[in-house]
Amino acid sequence: MTSLPLGVKVEDSAFGKPAGGGEGQAPSAAAATAAAMGADEEGAKPKVSPSLLPFSVEALMADHRKPGAKESALAASEGAQAAGGSAQPLGVRPGSLGAPDAPSSPRPLGHFSVGGLLKLPEDALVKAESPEKPERTPWMQSPRFSPPPARRLSPPACTLRKHKTNRKPRTPFTTAQLLALERKFRQKQYLSIAERAEFSSSLSLTETQVKIWFQNRRAKAKRLQEAELEKLKMAAKPMLPPAAFGLSFPLGGPAAVAAAAGASLYGASGPFQRAALPVAPVGLYTAHVGYSMYHLT
């Protein structure tokens, strides 16, 4: 049994030696039979025509397989585009998808720039460094697009206290008038109508001016009096409590305790009698005495 390269098994009995032939004719007959069987198998398979679509594997590998496949793919893609219509997507040329290996010319750098889209000059998109060049584009010069000119803010004015519009100006008293008013205020803080009329005429002032001056002076005296009282209260409070450094003894308290203790210790008890030690009274005042830092100075 002989194994052929095409996978066809041929028995030796089928291809026996002919009666009048030699041994060299057997291999040639077997090869012819195998070739005929291979041709029949290839004829039985359906033949698939190569696809000429631009995205197919056949079109992509056309350069490596056949030298004329590239031209046929280009022609087929151009015919399909012509039959489909003349509308083409932006930036796509005929045959560019069918032949990706074809070199494409690079587009200029400013093709997709903002200046190319708006069709504006390049100097209009760049801010001028010198004051001679215009700082805004021509279409912004119109009052519709140009912003209003910036206003220079002046420094804020000092806000004064608002007074009434019909407010009378402050009366400028002279030194002699002020001395006379102060002397009269020390004598009497409240003036009667007759006294006020007489006093105002002597100073060449109106009764209203004298009345207002006395009102303001009484308010000032009240403020000064309250401040003096506050100072006295603060001065009356000691810096440290007197119990920290002072000693206070009640009248007769320690003396009575010491006398009782001496009488019990040295009293007449036993063979030897001793006189009790006199204890000087410590309480010299009728009230508590505090010896603090104020009394030691």
From Swiss-Prot:
The keyword DNA damage does not apply. Residues 1-50, 66-108, 129-157 are annotated as: Disordered. Keywords: Developmental protein, DNA-binding, Homeobox, Isopeptide bond, Nucleus, Repressor, Transcription, Transcription regulation, Ubl conjugation. GO terms for cellular component: nuclear periphery. Residues 166-225 bind DNA. There is a cross-link at K9, K127 (Glycyl lysine isopeptide (Lys-Gly) (interchain with G-Cter in SUMO)). Signal peptide: none annotated. InterPro entries: HD, HD_metazoa, Homeobox_CS, Homeodomain-like_sf, Msh_Homeobox_Regulators. It holds the Pfam family Homeodomain. One of its GO terms (biological process) is inner ear development. Residues 25-38, 71-88 have a biased composition (Low complexity). GO terms for molecular function: DNA-binding transcription factor activity, RNA polymerase II-specific; RNA polymerase II transcription regulatory region sequence-specific DNA binding; transcription cis-regulatory region binding. It is found in: Nucleus. Sumoylated by PIAS1, desumoylated by SENP1. Acts as a transcriptional repressor. Capable of transcription autoinactivation. Binds to the consensus sequence 5'-C/GTAAT-3' in downstream activin regulatory elements (DARE) in the gene promoter, thereby repressing the transcription of CGA/alpha-GSU and GNRHR. Represses transcription of myoblast differentiation factors. Binds to core enhancer regions in target gene promoters of myoblast differentiation factors with binding specificity facilitated by interaction with PIAS1. Interacts with CREBBP/CBP, TBP and SP1; interaction with these transcription activators may inhibit autoinactivation. Interacts (via C-terminus) with PIAS1 (via N-terminus); the interaction is required for the localization of both proteins to the nuclear periphery and specific binding of MSX1 to the core enhancer region in target gene promoters. Interacts with H1-5. Belongs to the Msh homeobox family. This is Homeobox protein MSX-1. The lineage of its organism: Eukaryota, Metazoa, Chordata, Craniata, Vertebrata. The gene is MSX1.
